[in-house]
Amino acid sequence: MEKLTVLNYTLNVITLMNSTLHTILEDPGMAYFPYIASVLTVLFTLHRASIPTMKIALKTSKCSYKVVKYCIVTIFNTLLKLADYKEQITTKDEIEKQMDRVAKEMRRQLEMIDKLTTREIEQVKLLKRIYDKLMVRATDGIDMTKEINQKNVKTLEEWKSGKNPYEPKEVTAAM
């Protein structure tokens, strides 16, 4: 009985695979199958050929790792552009450069915020001092002599010459 279930399961899997292959081959999208197969063949060949080439390049040159890495990234970015992808592969060096640029910009903005905050604090202190000077202070008794300008009023007898110096005089002009 067990052998029959295993045989039945195997036949079901074969039938499923056959029906799947028939639906794939009947699909009009399969017109692109030769192109897809050729691209996959080229990629596989590049993969198989690049590993020994990289090993030789790493052994013969001291700085070849960066060169090979740059070449591989360039090749993959070119393939992605050919496939109309907007994304690109970046190396760690490029990511570090971008992170440094972002960190530098953040530092610059923090310094600007610090300067602006310092200026605002100084302005608030200045406004407080101006407010304190303009603040009306209550007094017990108000001296009105300052208001009506009578504090330094002198009488005619108190003037040195006996005349009021602010009195108008007669002036004659030559013609």
UniProtKB/Swiss-Prot annotation:
Glycans are attached at residues 8, 18. Ca(2+) binds at residues 120, 123. Changing residue 48 to K: In strain: Isolate 6. Residues 52-175 are cytoplasmic. Pfam families: Rota_NSP4. Its main location: host cell. One of its GO terms (molecular function) is toxin activity. Keywords: Activation of host autophagy by virus, Calcium, Enterotoxin, Glycoprotein, Host endoplasmic reticulum, Host membrane, Host-virus interaction, Ion channel, Ion transport, Membrane, Metal-binding, Secreted, Signal-anchor, Toxin, Transmembrane, Transmembrane helix, Transport, Viral ion channel, Virulence. The N-glycosyl content is primarily Man(9)GlcNAc, with a small amount of Man(8)GlcNAc. Coiled coil: none annotated. It is found in: Host rough endoplasmic reticulum membrane; Host membrane, Host caveola; Secreted. GO terms for biological process: monoatomic ion transmembrane transport; symbiont-mediated activation of host autophagy; viral process. Residues 1-28 are lumenal. It is a single-pass type III membrane protein. Changing residue 125 to E: In strain: Isolate 6. Belongs to the rotavirus NSP4 family. Plays an essential role in the virus replication cycle by acting as a viroporin. Creates a pore in the host endoplasmic reticulum and as a consequence releases Ca(2+) in the cytoplasm of infected cell. In turn, high levels of cytoplasmic calcium trigger membrane trafficking and transport of viral ER-associated proteins to viroplasms, sites of viral genome replication and immature particle assembly. Binds 1 calcium ion per tetramer. This is Non-structural glycoprotein 4.
